[in-house]
């Protein structure tokens, strides 16, 4: 049985985090001889994945069970067309973590809507995704923004060009 993975991608804006992750998502949805195809869901807080079909937050459970394997995204808008607030993004992430399973979740720009002191229940939900057969990738602008609990649970880290000095954080890498 496969073990779900928790990954982090770190780098400043415009260095290819989303581009590289999109290529990975294509492989994920396509599958291989070793791995069956799996669906992908993006929490698109910046509305930047315009080439990917959107779904409503209320349809996440249906998407999770649908036989068609594809990439979909949650746009940063309420059903009435107003932009989601920072609290709405946090609530949306809870909803996704509760209902989406058997795929890959990309949490884009997580520091935009979650403060330096992430709620413990949200971090716990992200870190205990194994029971949902859910792989998670989180995009961060800075390596220093990854919380200790997330560091402890990471399976992998992809590092892009960054303005942070890694020397400040090198002790975090000792077991990675």
Task: List each language-model region with its residue ranges.
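Pre-Walker A (Motif I) flank of P-loop NTPase domains
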Residues: 2-8, 38
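Hydrophobic/aromatic beta-strand patches that form the interior of the parallel beta-sheet core
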Residues: 7, 41-43, 55, 72, ...
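Conserved P-loop NTPase motor cores
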Residues: 7-26, 83-175
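Walker A/P-loop NTP-binding active-site region of P-loop NTPases
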Residues: 15-61
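Intrinsically disordered, low-complexity coil segments
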Residues: 29-36, 77-87
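Structural alpha-beta junctions
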Residues: 32-36, 54-68, 95-101, 132
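Terminal domain-start segments
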Residues: 39, 73-76, 87-92
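Conserved P-loop NTPase mechanochemical-coupling segment
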Residues: 62-84
